A protein has these predicted regions:
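Short, conserved SAM-binding/catalytic segment
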Residues: 60-66, 128-129
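Conserved SAM-binding strand-loop segment of SAM-dependent methyltransferases
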Residues: 68-73
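N-terminal Rossmann-like NAD(P) cofactor-binding module of classical short-chain dehydrogenase/reductase
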Residues: 86-87
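Contiguous beta-strand/loop segments that form the cofactor/metal-binding neighborhood of enzyme cores
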Residues: 150, 162, 167-168, 175-209, ...
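NAD(P)-binding Rossmann-fold cofactor-contacting core
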Residues: 44-62
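N-terminal secretory signal peptides and thylakoid transit peptides that target proteins
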Residues: 1-11
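Beta-strand-loop-alpha-helix segment that lines the small-molecule cofactor/substrate pocket
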Residues: 91-92, 96-144, 158, 376
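Hydrophobic/small residue at the entry helix of a nucleotide-binding pocket
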Residues: 31
């Protein structure tokens, strides 16, 4: 694997000292700040930071390149013709509008997952990206992590035999929200954007992840990674039907549950499940995030940072025939590799590891899951019309 230093030096050699990729970060909360650091370490000039909340903006500027410009309106960012790319790490309900505006302004985009908030939004993103020819990487970094790339190769090689069932779990434990107050200027109307208008609500602002107007919560946020990986491994573009059920939220004052299961039915004649439990014991093992591909000959267990192959003859499943473990690698290595792939594709103009078509395939499932969760019905998808029905 190319080291960070080797990548930066190679990029400089190809582009020249005055041809560094110049990017802006739109949305400078926790994830936006992490990505700012990743891009900067890989030789990108972070020339601008945009956020509607003053403390986030200031925090992002401290990490960005020297002389970075500050904005609170993303449209002004896109007017800068010297920018090559933008990094979108805003709440989910803004993803589609910002991504489409960015590619139409001639920018390449690193777009955090989930790609969109509705099926129609995702379809519009795909059309805009293909119409403009821009490079867009969706932030599902498992596609760039060598452990998961090797797992995909194992499935593609047919080692598991026919796969009729894929099961997955994501376990964690989350405490109550800390009490927080606004500590600087916030452009509330700009933050709401395409969402329903309402009076300023600091609790909603800080905990937007758990309200349906802005996101699908942990259910969508974590399933985005797992569902994307399942469909990537299985070469699936859409489900036939999705059913989701969940309990009441364990956290006070929010809408989206943190304990739920999704059942996905596919035209390739297999079923997949995803179960989220955020009031569970946090397993400090490779199995707190586990996706199992149940082949007729071999089972493949994909952990967050590991994989293991178990044939029928594995005594008590204690001795896999093949395995790989990289403890602690995912949190840093996967994102770094994903950002590196995006930067390489800006130069080569090739499709990145997580193209928008894959992002939309996942977005379809996630949107259907939320529809099912809220309606209590099995949701069916029509690939000809791109519409759903119960």
């Amino acid at each position: 694997m190319t080291s960070r230093r080797e990548f930066v030096l190679a990029s400089a050699a190809v582009l020249g000292a005055n041809d560094r990729i110049r990017a802006a970060v739109i949305g400078s909360g926790g994830r936006g700040q992490l990505l700012t650091g990743e891009f900067k370490e890989l030789g990108t000039e972070i020339a601008a930071v945009c956020d509607v909340y003053e403390p986030n903006l200031n925090a992002g500027l401290k990490i960005a390149s020297t002389g970075a410009k500050a904005y609170n309106d993303y449209r002004r960012v896109l007017e800068d013709k010297a920018l090559d790319a933008v990094i979108i790490a805003t709440p989910d309900h803004w993803h589609a509008r910002m991504a489409i505006d960015a590619v139409e302004a001639g920018k390449d985009v690193y777009l955090e997952k989930p790609m969109a908030h509705t099926i129609a939004e995702g379809a519009d993103i795909v059309k805009a990206v293909r119409r403009t020819g821009r490079v867009v990487q969706v932030g599902t970094q498992r596609r760039s992590f060598d452990v998961w790339i090797e797992g995909k190769q194992i499935v593609d090689a047919g080692k598991l035999g026919n796969i009729r069932l894929v099961s997955s779990i994501w376990l964690n434990r989350q405490g109550d929200f800390p009490e927080r107050k606004l500590e600087g200027k916030l452009d509330w109307q700009q933050w709401l954007g395409p969402a329903a208008k309402r009076d300023l609500d600091a609790f909603r602002f800080f905990n937007w992840y758990y309200f349906f107007d802005y996101s699908g919560g942990l259910l969508v946020g974590q399933a985005a990674h797992v569902v994307d990986a399942i469909q990537w491994f299985m070469n699936s573009k859409y489900p036939l039907a999705v059913t989701c059920s969940g309990g009441k939220p364990n956290l006070k004052g929010v809408e989206v549950t943190d304990t739920a299961s999704i059942l996905m039915e596919y035209p390739e004649n297999y079923f997949a499940t995803f179960t989220l439990g955020y009031k569970a014991m946090r397993y400090h093992t490779f199995n707190d995030q586990l996706t199992q591909f149940h082949g007729e000959r071999v089972r493949l267990d994909m952990g967050r940072e590991s994989y293991a192959l178990y044939p029928e003859t594995s005594a008590m499943e204690l001795k896999p025939v093949a395995e790989k473990k990289q403890p602690g690698a995912f949190w840093k290595t996967a994102t770094t590799a994903h950002v590196r792939n995006f930067l390489e594709c800006i130069r080569s103009r090739k499709d990145p590891n997580a193209p928008v078509e894959g992002g939309q395939a996942t977005n379809i499932v996630l949107t259907m899951a939320l529809d099912s969760l809220r309606s209590g019905k099995r949701i069916q998808y029509n690939p000809e019309t791109g519409r759903v029905r119960s």
